């Protein structure tokens, strides 16, 4: 009987932890959204750094990637020449990750960024 109660408590606790983690990410993303609406790019950068570190600690690649992309976007607003730094960071992340799925997603994202950049250059050259 006691074993059954202990198992129930453990199972309930395991079900509660992910829900609490998701709520904390949701709360942080709501803060990011509000800062973005108020045109506070430095606040967005600070919050996305926090989300990235939290995702890294919890091994939550999806949150890490979302935070990294938002950070890149707002970092470009603050420092226009930071695009290449962000792209290099993505490339390093793709090289260092041990997860094949994460690596595939990162490589696909990097390829899309390069394709968009090439298209932008091509259309601007064609206009000249």
Predicted features by range, described:
Residues 1-28:
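Bacterial Sec-dependent N-terminal signal peptides
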Residues 39-49, 79-89:
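Helix-turn-helix repeat elements of alpha-solenoid scaffolds
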Residues 45, 65, 84, 104-105:
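Conserved positions within tetratricopeptide repeat
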Residues 54, 93-96:
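Residue position in alpha-helical solenoids
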Residues 122-128:
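Conserved small/polar residues in nucleotide/adenosyl-binding loops
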